[in-house]
Amino acid sequence: LGKSIQYRRPVTHILGDHWGATFQLTFASMAVAIFIGLGAGILSAVRRHTWVDYGAQIFAILGVSFPSFWVGLILVWIFAIVLGWLPAISNGFGPQLILPSLTLGTAAAAILARLTRSSMLDVLSSDYIRTARAKGLRERIVVWGHALRNALIPVMTVIGLEFGGLLAGAVIIEAVYFRQGLGLRLIEAITSRDYPVIQALVLFAALLY
């Protein structure tokens, strides 16, 4: 892969030094997206036409409408500057990973929420669900024991595709929170015209996607 023009180091060493921070952010964001997205989608379908459903749909619309860097700046302003609860700069794990993972995972959570709701509503209207209800099974068993397993099949496919999107989105989020990962290295390489690093990082992201 060659040597970095800026750092005079092999590109593989730069990848090795910074890939961990990016993957921490990506996996944490995926966990946030799955937890919030699936939870909101399931509750929205089960509580259809209630305030829970409407709130989840509003979240899904707003989540995919706002750009991630804007969401990141708003979260920094609220939780780091105004409230002072969380650090504005993310260079590690634990509390320093909360704001970046929330920022990056919001859009993916919104997508998963809409897909989960649609899939759950489709399954809940199936014949075998009506049969299970007619036999007198509890609604909790019908939803969690029968409907959810089939409703998650298309959702799991999208979760796999979202991983690549989160990895690519880490470029912007690492710049917002000054996280020392591959995304920040890519931005620095672009501004300094460090072409070997740019080529290596783009190839790395393409292979993972």
What are these regions (language model features)?
Residues 12-20:
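Alpha-helical transmembrane segments of multi-pass membrane transporters/translocases
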Residues 1-13:
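Short membrane-interfacial helix/loop motifs at transmembrane-helix boundaries
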Residues 58-87, 103-108, 114:
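Membrane-water interface segments at the C-terminal ends of transmembrane alpha-helices
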Residues 19-52, 68, 90-209:
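Alpha-helical transmembrane segments of integral membrane proteins
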Residues 55:
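Acidic/polar active-site rim loop that often engages polyanionic ligands
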Residues 1, 48, 82-85, 90:
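Glycine-rich, flexible loop/turn motifs
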